[in-house]
């Protein structure tokens, strides 16, 4: 009887000790809003901070490499910030507050951008009936060149896209994607790529001009895929 009691006591001590020394874990899931473009190689770096100090780094070109799912084990209580750059080189972050020893899960979207504050200034968003917004695109690289255009117009409550002389109406998802592209052009930061994408957006007497040298965003080609339009090469 004494032996059984002692054994149960020993098991209880071990259990309490293990529970006391256990730590939390965070699983970072990398996802994409655009299911047509899920290239992990376009995410160059992820940094994890605890209470303001960096504790882990992941990269596209050096170990430990960025993977679709990243698990951080043996984490003590505290505030953890997951910092990364999206496809237009905006620095974004997610915060996980660890207060107990359990499994935490957080998703980061590599192609998410904080563009919604710019929607009110969008030419397409403010398009009036029987007017048009013109998009001109030119891409030049070491081994390619391309020159294309889209015209967005409005008749009644319907929006239309014209490409290569053909026109059709746009659904809500397609219209939102065009507005998103226009807004994200305003957010694109530094580049450094040998490929330069030049955008001009015109509405009446107003015109906006942008250059994308990120080699990550690929906004024009992604939009053409969504609209089911073919690329033109020159």
What are these regions (language model features)?
Residues 45-62:
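Short amphipathic beta-strand segments in non-cytosolic proteins
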Residues 158-190:
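Mature extracytoplasmic domains of secretory-pathway proteins
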Residues 32-44, 114-166, 191-206, 234:
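N-terminal domain-start interaction segment
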Residues 49-53, 76, 99-103, 153-157, ...:
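Short, solvent-exposed coil/turn segments at beta-strand boundaries
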Residues 1-31:
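Bacterial Sec-dependent N-terminal signal peptides
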Residues 94-134, 173, 186-188, 195-234:
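Short, well-ordered, aromatic-rich surface patches in folded extracellular/luminal domains
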Residues 63-74:
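Short, surface-exposed beta-strand/beta-hairpin micro-motifs centered on an aromatic residue
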Residues 76-88:
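A short, solvent-exposed beta-strand micro-motif common in secreted/extracellular proteins
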């Amino acid at each position: 009887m004494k032996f059984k009691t002692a054994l149960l006591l020993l098991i209880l001590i071990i259990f309490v000790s293990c529970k006391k020394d256990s730590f939390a874990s965070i699983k970072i899931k990398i996802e994409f809003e655009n299911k047509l473009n899920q290239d992990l190689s376009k995410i160059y770096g992820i940094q994890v901070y605890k209470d303001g100090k960096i504790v882990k780094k992941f990269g596209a070109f050096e170990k430990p490499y960025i993977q679709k799912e990243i698990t951080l084990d043996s984490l003590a209580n505290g505030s953890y910030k997951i910092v990364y750059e999206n496809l237009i080189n905006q620095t974004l972050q997610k915060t996980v507050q660890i207060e107990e020893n359990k499994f935490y899960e957080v998703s980061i979207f590599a192609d998410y951008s904080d563009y919604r504050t710019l929607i009110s200034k969008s030419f397409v968003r403010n398009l009036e009936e029987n007017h048009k917004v013109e998009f001109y695109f030119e891409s030049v690289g070491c081994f390619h060149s391309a020159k294309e255009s889209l015209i967005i117009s409005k008749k009644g409550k319907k929006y239309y896209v014209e490409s290569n002389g053909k026109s059709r109406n746009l659904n809500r998802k397609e219209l939102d994607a065009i507005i998103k592209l226009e807004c994200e052009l305003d957010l694109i930061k530094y580049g450094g790529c040998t490929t330069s994408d030049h955008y001009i957006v015109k509405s009446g007497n107003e015109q906006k001009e942008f250059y994308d040298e990120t080699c990550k965003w690929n906004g024009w080609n992604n939009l053409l895929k969504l609209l089911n339009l073919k690329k033109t090469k020159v």
